[in-house]
From Swiss-Prot:
One of its GO terms (molecular function) is exodeoxyribonuclease VII activity. Its main location: cytoplasm. It catalyses: Exonucleolytic cleavage in either 5'- to 3'- or 3'- to 5'-direction to yield nucleoside 5'-phosphates. It comes from Helicobacter pylori (strain G27). The gene is xseB. This is Exodeoxyribonuclease 7 small subunit.
């Protein structure tokens, strides 16, 4: 389980050409990774360095999950708004 969390994709810098080629995770996958990170952060034997690395990874997962949720909300709003051109 520990190794699985660190296999998540890092957010590439915005200028990286490979950003579009990186596999995308679903909202549920991001939430699952975040839940795993929270479980690990509760481990009293976790070192400070590992805890900080895990926290950074968890924050990335949270950010990406929030973006997916925001995009879904915007898409829902778009579908609910009648097209004025029609």
């Amino acid at each position: 389980m520990q190794d699985e969390l660190f296999e998540t994709e890092k957010i590439p810098p915005k200028n990286t050409k490979n950003a579009k080629n990186a596999p995308k995770k679903s909202f549920e996958e991001h939430v699952h990774s975040l839940e795993q990170a929270i479980d690990r952060l509760n481990d009293p034997n976790l070192s400070l360095k590992d805890g900080m690395d895990l926290y950074k990874t968890a924050m990335q997962e949270l950010f990406l999950a929030q973006k997916l949720l925001e995009n879904a909300y915007l898409e829902h709003e778009k579908l609910q708004t009648p097209d004025k051109k029609a």
